[in-house]
């Protein structure tokens, strides 16, 4: 009896870890680096090989939403601040800070403008969102884009680090500058 109880106790954590993450009704807040759902209602979830195929075909706009690291508020005034470099999937539009649970009006306008730029203003043009593996930011941005009326939305949960980990090339990214 004791052995059975110990065996059950050892197996339960694995069962808990294997449970699927539910999609929230709204947007997900912090912590953003956490297990993500299997998919996003209304979007097409793609994994590494499918994302690579879409990238090679060149018909889908790739959008990275990894946030920029903020300048520390307590940094002395005469200190030079250098942002950490960010590598991403080649040809990607980097729209940082657009995957948070709540966006400021400026961040919302930046996302809308970036989407118009990469889709030519066509809400039927396919657009793929990513960040890092197990990052809710790309899920939030894809969900928000669906709410804006875009109809061909892809979500790539493995993100840029999954891409790089598979040996696919990356390149330095700069945030998209809108006119």
Label every PLM stretch briefly.
Residues 51, 61-66:
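Short hydrophobic beta-strand that contains or immediately precedes a catalytic carboxylate
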Residues 4-14:
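Bacterial N-terminal signal peptides
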Residues 69:
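Glycine-rich nucleotide phosphate-binding loop and flanking beta-alpha elements
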Residues 16-49, 54-57, 72-128, 132-179:
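Rhodanese-like catalytic fold shared by cysteine-dependent sulfurtransferases
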């Amino acid at each position: 009896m004791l052995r059975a109880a110990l065996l059950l106790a050892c197996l339960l954590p694995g069962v808990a870890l294997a449970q699927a993450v539910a999609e929230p009704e709204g947007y997900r807040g912090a912590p953003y680096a956490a297990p993500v759902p299997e998919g996003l209602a209304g979007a097409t979830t793609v994994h590494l090989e499918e994302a690579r195929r879409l990238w090679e075909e060149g018909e889908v706009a790739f959008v990275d939403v990894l946030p920029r690291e903020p300048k520390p508020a307590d940094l002395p005034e005469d200190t030079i601040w250098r942002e950490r470099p960010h590598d991403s999937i080649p040809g990607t539009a980097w729209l940082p800070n657009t995957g948070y649970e709540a966006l400021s009006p400026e961040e919302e306008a930046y996302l809308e403008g970036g989407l118009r730029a990469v889709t030519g203003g066509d809400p039927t043009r396919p657009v793929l969102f990513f960040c890092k593996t197990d990052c809710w930011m790309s899920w939030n941005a894809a969900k928000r884009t669906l709410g804006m009326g875009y109809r061909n939305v892809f979500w790539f949960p493995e993100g840029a680090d999954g891409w790089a980990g598979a040996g696919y090339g990356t390149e330095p990214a700069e945030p998209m500058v809108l006119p």
